[in-house]
UniProtKB/Swiss-Prot annotation:
InterPro entries listed in its UniProt record: PSII_PsbM, PSII_PsbM_sf
Protein name, as recorded: Photosystem II reaction center protein M
Family, per entry: Belongs to the PsbM family.
Subcellular location as annotated: Plastid, Chloroplast thylakoid membrane
Natural source organism: Agrostis stolonifera (Creeping bentgrass)
Function: One of the components of the core complex of photosystem II (PSII). PSII is a light-driven water:plastoquinone oxidoreductase that uses light energy to abstract electrons from H(2)O, generating O(2) and a proton gradient subsequently used for ATP formation. It consists of a core antenna complex that captures photons, and an electron transfer chain that converts photonic excitation into a charge separation. This subunit is found at the monomer-monomer interface.
NCBIfam families: PS_II_psbM
Stored Pfam families: PsbM
Upper taxonomic lineage: Eukaryota, Viridiplantae, Streptophyta, Embryophyta, Tracheophyta
TM region(s), chain numbering: 5-25
Keywords: Chloroplast, Membrane, Photosynthesis, Photosystem II, Plastid, Reaction center, Thylakoid, Transmembrane, Transmembrane helix
GO biological process: photosynthesis, light reaction
Topology with respect to the bilayer: Single-pass membrane protein
Main location: plastid
Superkingdom of origin organism: Eukaryota
Amino acid sequence: MEVNILAFIATALFILIPTAFLLIIYVKTASQND
């Protein structure tokens, strides 16, 4: 099977961007609680 690079990148971005966004919010919240 041929791997669709663009589809792979799009999927990776679709997963990583929201994850990074949530991590940033979590870190900011954790810092404020300190």
